[in-house]
Amino acid sequence: METNTVLTFTQEEVDYIRSQRLARIATASKKGDPDVAPVGFDFDGTYFYVGGHILIRTIKYKNVLENPKVSFVIDDLASIKPWTPRSLKIRGTADLADRDNGYLGPAKYIRIKPTHKTTININRPFKYR
């Protein structure tokens, strides 16, 4: 991982993260070819972990080996009327980590260290205009 700075999350953000099971991870090859994939994830309060049943065969795995910069988005619709999207977008660096107790059991995971975050409708009430 690049830096020692730890990004912190508000209690509202942590509650939202823990209420969701699906996210999207965006990676890029060393040439800059982009890829985005829906993924399950774990959050330990500091890092996000992304696994897969055959992780080492995925584009995201290969891309992280070549280029550690990633984006990670957790989002949903809290309501349709009024229209209330919610999201937490993370930018950060990723590496590979072996975990004994991840959501898929003992395995290799992509570990994401958040360095920047942007939220919509999580830390304050949504006001429809």
Q: Which residues does each predicted region cover?
A:
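Short beta-strand segments
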Residues: 21-55, 72
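A generic local structural motif
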Residues: 9-12, 36-37, 57-59
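Short gly/ser/thr-rich secondary-structure transition/capping motifs
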Residues: 5-7, 53, 95
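Short solvent-exposed loop/turn micro-motifs enriched in small/polar/acidic residues
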Residues: 18-20, 33-34, 87, 103-105
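Extreme N-terminal tail/first-helix region
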Residues: 1-22, 129
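Flexible glycine-rich active-site/ligand-binding loops centered on an Asp-His dyad
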Residues: 109-129
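Short, structured beta-strand-loop surface elements
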Residues: 55-116
